[in-house]
């Protein structure tokens, strides 16, 4: 199973200009039922959309509709951050703190035994996760970042 990072779900948006062909090709080779999102990814998307709605309402409105479609498409496959996830996340900050959202996404993936799919592989270094970068056409199915 794959936990898609924010940059991946954003890249896969239909009609996105300059969409990376490697990412689309990677996604098309996988059964979509294996794709999951973290509630933290929804937070990041929502934050970006709210900011865009303030400065460019038509574009913000278009992305709001896109996000509604994402939530519908991923119904039952959006993983929450829970009381079981919290200690896993806390441990990822010891001995070296990392950005909270990255740690929360990593902890969610660890809790469920999922791989993380991201362009920002260094954000998940030393977590013990299998990390996939679909922008690299030569990326193996799993790269261990432990």
Short names for language-model regions:
Residues 1-37, 51-69, 138-140:
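Short, well-structured N-terminal submotif of metal-dependent ribonuclease cores
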């Amino acid at each position: 199973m794959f936990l898609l990072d924010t940059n991946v779900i954003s890249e896969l948006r239909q009609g996105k200009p300059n969409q990376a062909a490697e990412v689309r090709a990677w996604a098309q080779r996988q059964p979509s039922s294996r794709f999951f999102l973290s509630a933290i990814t929804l937070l990041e998307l929502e934050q970006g959309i709210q900011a865009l709605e303030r400065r460019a309402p038509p574009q913000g409105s278009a992305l709001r509709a896109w996000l509604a479609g994402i939530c519908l498409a991923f119904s039952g496959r959006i993983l929450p951050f829970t009381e079981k996830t919290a200690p896993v996340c806390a441990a990822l900050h010891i001995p070296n703190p990392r950005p909270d959202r990255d740690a929360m996404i990593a902890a969610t993936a660890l809790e469920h035994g999922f791989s993380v799919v991201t362009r920002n592989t260094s954000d998940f270094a030393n977590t013990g996760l299998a990390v996939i970068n679909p922008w690299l056409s030569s990326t193996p199915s799993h790269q261990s970042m432990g």
